[in-house]
Design a protein with these regions (language model features):
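Bilobed periplasmic-binding protein/Venus flytrap-like ligand-binding cleft at the lobe interface
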Residues: 280-315
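Extracytoplasmic/periplasmic substrate-binding proteins
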Residues: 215-288
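Conserved N-terminal structural module of periplasmic/extracytoplasmic solute-binding proteins
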Residues: 1-100, 373
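Extracytoplasmic/periplasmic solute-binding protein
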Residues: 139-144, 148, 161-218, 241
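Short glycine- and hydrophobic/aromatic-rich loop-to-beta-strand nucleating segment
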Residues: 148-152, 282-283
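C-terminal capping/gating helix-and-loop segments adjacent to ligand/active sites or protein-protein/ligand interfaces
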Residues: 2, 6-7, 309-373
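Hinge/lid segment of periplasmic solute-binding proteins
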Residues: 99-149, 160, 180-191
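Short helices/loops that flank or line small-molecule/ion binding pockets
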Residues: 83-96, 103, 229-244, 357-360
Length: 373
């Protein structure tokens, strides 16, 4: 039998441990931000399921700024798979960041957003807010977006291809002459027809932009519209196809490689309007503390949104214009004319079917897009 003094010490230790655990949970879920100090910390657990190119770098920088402005809050960022997020045994974090196609049942994971979370001072673009809306409830707050462009290898048209501008130390494309008013050359159809692989593209939303750019299709490979975005990018980088649909993040990354001597000269084509699924959204879960809403509001603020330009990403705010030249300026200008964002919670098969039918001229653009909004 244990001596009486050992039992007393063990009991006291258990009581102290339970008290500390209860104190931590209370502070995590109940303490208002105004009462937090450096000694009373609130922890925000953030999961990123997916991100546009440059999104993680922007987010990490903004989280550091957010913590400096709110000394009582610490953030913890983790990258997870969509499967891990939706597994029934998963203990959900406080905030989840994701892209269209990652989540199909938002009501099972997230709380509807209200107040500043749903619309930051009424300055968020409605087209992007609709992307995070499901059954008339706003579940996802758009944080930034990218688009789809068509990249064309210089091997097809050496005289027209250009080497992208050098990048700065931060990775942002350096300033170039504004070409937004200069008509883009047409797609080099005849030259593409002579290539072993004329064109590659992912399926789904990329096909909408591709259809707007092509007056006539070149010969399509057997794997057309079946590869992932990353696989298409790799094929273009290895010169296994002479033209390819890339995300703007991929296009900016490849421009950096080219200016550094690792890529090759090429040009890009942008459509006169933007149809995209490259939207980064944030949602809060049921047990999230009040600081989660504060973080979302901060990420949609003008201060945080202006910093998107360092990564070639686009703002979700109506009152900001970030670019004067280059790829990003062309895309931003097109979005001011017309912007459509595919609903985030639709099954990928639904988007693929509509885009494929439009690509082959079986339905009109309006018929394809309206069910996807």
């Amino acid at each position: 039998m244990e001596p009486r003094w050992q039992r007393i010490i063990l009991t006291a230790a258990c009581i102290a441990t339970l008290a500390l655990t209860g104190l931590f949970l209370t502070r995590l879920t109940e303490s208002p931000l105004s009462s937090l100090t450096a000694r009373d910390r609130s922890f925000l657990r953030i999961w990123a399921v997916n991100a546009p190119g440059g999104g993680q770098a922007w987010l990490k920088a903004q989280l550091r700024t957010f913590e400096k402005q709110h000394p009582g809050v610490s953030t913890y960022l983790r990258t997870v798979s969509a499967t891990e997020l939706t597994t029934s045994e998963t203990i959900l974090p406080d905030v989840v960041l994701y892209m269209p196609g990652d989540v199909t049942e938002p009501s099972a994971l997230f709380l509807p957003l209200t107040g500043d979370m749903a619309a930051r001072d009424g300055l968020l673009r409605e087209e992007l807010l609709r992307c995070g809306r499901w059954q008339n409830q706003q579940y996802g707050l758009p944080l930034c977006w990218g688009a789809w462009i068509l990249a064309i290898d210089s091997a097809l048209e050496p005289g027209s291809a250009t080497t992208p501008a050098p990048t700065t130390l931060l990775g942002r494309p350096a300033a170039t002459l504004d070409a937004s008013s200069t008509p883009e050359p047409d797609y080099p159809l005849e030259a593409a027809r002579q290539a072993d692989c004329a064109l590659q593209s992912p399926g789904g939303t990329a096909l909408f932009t591709l259809s707007l750019l092509l007056e006539e299709q070149p010969p399509l490979p057997a794997a057309f519209a079946t590869l992932s975005s990353g696989e298409v990018y790799a094929a273009f980088q290895r010169r296994q196809c002479v033209t390819a649909m890339l995300t703007t993040g991929q296009a900016i990354a490849f421009a950096g490689l080219t200016s550094g001597g690792s890529g090759f000269p090429h040009r890009i084509m942008t459509a006169d309007e933007v149809i995209t699924d490259q939207v980064w959204l944030a949602s809060v879960t049921a047990d999230a503390p009040p600081e989660a809403a504060l973080l979302l509001s901060f990420l949609a603020s003008a201060e945080a949104q202006k910093a998107l330009s360092a990564q070639g990403l686009h703002t979700v705010r109506d009152d900001l214009t970030l670019y004067a030249s280059g790829i990003s300026a062309r895309v931003e200008s097109a979005a001011h004319r017309a912007l459509s964002a595919i609903n985030a919670y639709l099954p990928a098969e639904t988007v693929q079917s509509a885009a494929w039918q439009f690509f082959h001229g079986q339905i009109t653009l309006n018929e394809a897009l309206l069910p996807l909004m």
